[in-house]
UniProtKB/Swiss-Prot annotation:
Cofactor(s), names only, from the UniProt record: Mn(2+)
Keyword Lipid biosynthesis among record annotations: no
Regulatory domain as annotated region, ranges: 390-506
Name of protein: 2-isopropylmalate synthase
Species of origin: Bacillus thuringiensis subsp. konkukian (strain 97-27)
Length: 506
């Protein structure tokens, strides 16, 4: 049975989702979880896009030990060399070079002839192969490219040294039958087909990204590209967790198995959702809150008698736990550390002390600490340890005529303390006005969302905010048992990003 490799582009294509703005620390958190998931290749970013992207790609490349780290690059020498500088320190570095091959792109975007495109493919792949051990070439807009020219372009790329050939459905235009036949056509029409791994990359504009990816596997693709939760620009990308579980459950049909650790799917989905602020729909396949829920009496009766009557996926397969009590206020440092290691987290002594202190504070107020609480706690503490400002004190009180007053004290990375107060028509508005006064921002609150992480009156709250000032928009999150504290943390998280970004572009 063939093993299907997974290439994750959450950190590159996924981050292009409107409103998503991840900082370096957040990208590294996702990269580490992708490594635990067993992703074969992770596209860490587009190194030539900006200095920030370059540094993020470089840090991920220098950190990840058990996956190939790849940078995107246009078919330009400057892009390729920049990508090399970013990922050369990786255990397994890869270049992903792309060039459009469809008539519409060649005519209106590239202003290049077919001969020019073929020459550019040859030169860029040849250069890439002289620097990188492996090179992936993508024929952008492949599904709207004339098939004979696509085959010709791919043959040029393979002969120049490309190890992986990606056939992207860039605008989500194709359907499963067409995509399957395209892979079969290339199998028959590319003389050097056997010398490369063929990959699929599907967008979801017509809602067929997962189905198209599975059709590509039927057609001979050995690598599937996509994102966690299917995030991405426009309607998103193929959701890797859906493709992986579909291959596993229906291996009788596809004669293929996903080469990832399925039990890490739920944890990866949750992490990506919380860091990006993109909420997973309750009815989403595999990772939605209702994915394993049954309300119909007939369904409930059937499941109670025999679970396979209405459930084709065991929740444990994807790491969906029963969220049982795991630690409490009497748990010691050693038990806490061992449990965090079991969940996949490792940290220095200083990091451990900070997170353990936060855990003890939570345990004093919350009766039962679950795995979901621990993941949220780790997520929050990691974010706050890396940000420019942190809240040291927060006080809110009623003034008059429904007006609230908030006093906020912030401390920056150098230990400087800033304090200010402001009023608002509600507690949250007052808190946000005070933070704005301290940071000297005049931004707009573009989005505010709150969700409970676990059940019960003592559940942790997760608040997501998006701030906008001019053309700049960033997101932030906060985790706390108190809603006002979580809201304040989220605002400081986003405001610190916004302030840094504005200073960077000035």
């Amino acid at each position: 049975m063939k093993q299907i490799l997974f290439m994750d582009t959450t950190l590159r294509d996924g981050e292009q989702s409107p409103g998503v703005n991840l900082n370096e620390q957040e990208k590294l958190q996702i990269a580490r979880q992708l490594e635990r998931l067993g992703i074969h290749v992770m596209e860490a970013g587009f190194a030539a896009a900006s200095e920030g992207d370059f540094q993020s790609v470089k840090r991920i490349a220098n950190t990840i030990q058990n996956a190939t780290v790849m940078s995107l690059a246009r078919a330009k020498e400057s892009d390729i060399r920049r990508a090399y500088e970013a990922v050369k320190g990786a255990v397994s570095p890869r270049l992903h070079v792309f060039l459009a091959t469809s008539d519409i792109h060649m005519k209106y975007k590239l202003c290049m002839s077919k001969e020019d495109v073929l020459d550019s493919i040859h030169r860029s792949v040849t250069l890439g192969k002289s620097l990188f051990p492996t090179v992936q070439f993508s024929a952008e807009d492949a599904t709207r490219t004339a098939r004979d020219f696509l085959a010709e372009a791919i043959e040029v790329a393979i002969r120049a040294g490309a190890n992986v050939i990606n056939i992207p459905d860039t605008v989500g235009y194709t359907n499963p039958e067409e995509y399957y036949s395209l892979f079969k056509y290339l199998q028959e029409s590319v003389p050097s087909y056997e010398k490369a791994i063929f990959s699929c990359h599907c967008h979801d504009d017509l809602g067929m990204a997962v189905a198209n990816s599975l059709a590509a596997v039927e057609g001979g693709a050995l690598q599937v590209e996509g994102t966690i939760n299917g995030i991405g620009e426009r309607a998103g990308n193929a959701a890797l967790e859906e493709v992986a579980v579909a291959l596993h459950i229906r291996k009788d049909f596809y004669k293929a198995e996903p080469s990832i650790t399925l039990k890490e799917i739920k944890a990866t989905s949750t992490l990506v959702s919380r860091l990006t602020g993109m909420v997973v729909p309750k009815n989403k396949a595999i990772v939605g809150a209702n994915a394993f829920a049954h309300e119909s009496g007939i369904h409930q009766d059937g499941v109670l008698k025999e679970v396979t009557t209405y459930e084709i996926i065991e929740p444990a397969l994807v790491g969906e736990s029963q969220n049982l009590f795991v630690l409490g206020k009497h748990s010691g440092r050693h038990a806490f550390t061992e449990k965090m290691k079991e969940l996949g987290y490792e940290f220095t002594n200083d990091e451990r002390d900070a997170v353990f202190e936060a855990f003890k504070k939570l345990a004093d107020r919350k009766k039962e600490i679950t795995e979901e609480d621990l993941r949220a706690l780790m997520l929050g503490e990691a974010a706050f340890a890396a940000q420019q400002y942190n809240i040291t004190q927060l006080q809110v009180h009623f003034v008059s005529n429904s007006t609230q007053c908030a006093t906020v004290v912030l401390k920056d990375e150098e230990g400087n303390v800033f304090e200010d107060a402001a009023t608002g028509s509600g507690s949250i508005e007052a808190i946000y006005n005070a933070i704005q006064r301290i940071l000297g921002l005049e931004c707009e609150l573009a989005d505010y969302r709150i969700q409970s992480i676990t059940q019960g009156q003592d559940a942790l709250a997760h608040v997501h905010v998006e701030l906008k000032e001019g053309a700049h928009q960033v997101s932030g999150f906060g985790v706390a048992q108190d809603v006002l504290e979580a809201s304040a943390r989220a605002y400081v998280h986003a405001a610190g990003k916004l302030k840094s970004f504005i200073q960077l572009v000035k």
